[in-house]
């Protein structure tokens, strides 16, 4: 009979098979009440599942992330329970857990409105408040199929027919009269599922295939308690205020239109930000000793077949033809950089060779996934490729890591989560090469004192990689930076250098991106700063305003001085009240407003005010220039006197 070993090493002996819930009760009534599921020998199981052999067991509660994910999954079933009561003809497809919540794809004969979602949310709460038990039954494949055929659940039948072996025993979960199928685990009782909210609905193809029927995807969020739910909803509210699409329109940064889906029309102020960001990256490239190159934006399909992109990536590539040749518009820069490397004989003495490009790339992203600057079809990559020897890998990765943190710190990003993806089952290269490559990446992170977690088997077939995910002020995660080793592409494209023993050697290639897509990074910055860009990035850094016409000439004189000092300045001589002008430029997030009245003209000075409403008093224009230049030159995140 089972001996159960708990996480603290203590053991409990039973003379009969026991469930996870039985073990929780044996430990104490408080734990039994909190028990959502269990981890038995490392595998998540339902609280009702029986254990009939010795095992290590951990009780899962809502304090564990796994517990929160389980209650979110059960909220998806709760959604199914409610929607079948409101609209019995609904056909249920799939309902997985996602970040912060869940969704369910449903086949419904009408398009859900906001009122429908509110009604559905209300019914879900009414059902959850009954605190009913969720009953799990393991049945044969045929029993499961018969149950869903009887309910006319054609999508569940399709899942059984296409994805589940006839030898399996699927888990059926009974929510009163509602039946769902899942691997589980799920909550034992709906008292765990009180803190949720439905958010929105959208279209989604069955199995993600546009040839299949369009279903409706209903999204919801769920949390362990009311406090966590409210905090999340507040973050969403703040995120909506910071939406880069809204701010981009308000500040006249860019627009997008149907004639060019996923392509950005940069307006003057948005393009100013883009060019400033590009200049910053270019400065760092020089500091870290990169060459800057420029490759063609399209190349013959034959080349993309050699690289393997055509075989694995063709659905995401735009193509065109001319004179009986087919060309691919590049989705990435790496093959072009190998072509540049291949020009002229290279020696081991020429390595490492660091090659960077602001490459104009295009990817045929699904139209439904496009989202402002965050998900586009045309974008500029700030990536680079380093050609080096195996012995140089660690030093080069070290340099890449330092560059990543150097650049992110400029924007105030401090929380950066790092993951190291290691060898997948299908890969090229010997185990010795992979051992060394993974060791070099891990050692470089350790040498820089950077904590990281492994992602076993998540590396590309051609090499391991490091991923850098930055967290913004709302703790949202943005995966931007990567350092990826590549043992494949240089050989596929016949790249080589002459080694120390006069032999031809294929170089190791390191793919390195820091910002990723320039467009996306500007979107991230827009939301991070809520449009209050640091002065060095702001499209207009100062605006000079008159109070009456008598100061117009003085305003123009000051504007020219500021412009000559390298400050982006505008003069506002409109016949409007000064309060109106200040409000307008404050809404435009202009860092500094310089006001000129008769007193300022007489003293040869200017009244300085920040966009946050702080009055900095009267200064000479030379002092203003000196202080602004210092703030801009240092790329400070803070304004004067902050």
UniProtKB/Swiss-Prot annotation:
Q: Name one GO cellular component term.
A: cytosol
- GO terms, biological process: threonyl-tRNA aminoacylation
Q: Provide the binding site for Zn(2+).
A: 334, 385, 511
| EC number(s) stated in the UniProt entry for this protein | 6.1.1.3
Pfam families found in the cross-reference section: HGTP_anticodon, TGS, tRNA-synt_2b, tRNA_SAD
Keywords on record: Aminoacyl-tRNA synthetase, ATP-binding, Cytoplasm, Ligase, Metal-binding, Nucleotide-binding, Protein biosynthesis, RNA-binding, tRNA-binding, Zinc
Q: Where is the TGS domain?
A: 1-61
InterPro entries in the record, alphabetically?
aa-tRNA-synt_IIb, aa-tRNA-synth_II, aa-tRNA-synth_II/BPL/LPL, Anticodon-bd, Anticodon-bd_dom_sf, Beta-grasp_dom_sf, TGS, TGS-like
Q: Which reaction does it catalyse?
A: tRNA(Thr) + L-threonine + ATP = L-threonyl-tRNA(Thr) + AMP + diphosphate + H(+)
Its function, per the record, reads:
Catalyzes the attachment of threonine to tRNA(Thr) in a two-step reaction: L-threonine is first activated by ATP to form Thr-AMP and then transferred to the acceptor end of tRNA(Thr). Also edits incorrectly charged L-seryl-tRNA(Thr).
Assigned protein family: Belongs to the class-II aminoacyl-tRNA synthetase family.
Protein known as: Threonine--tRNA ligase
Source species of the chain: Edwardsiella ictaluri (strain 93-146)
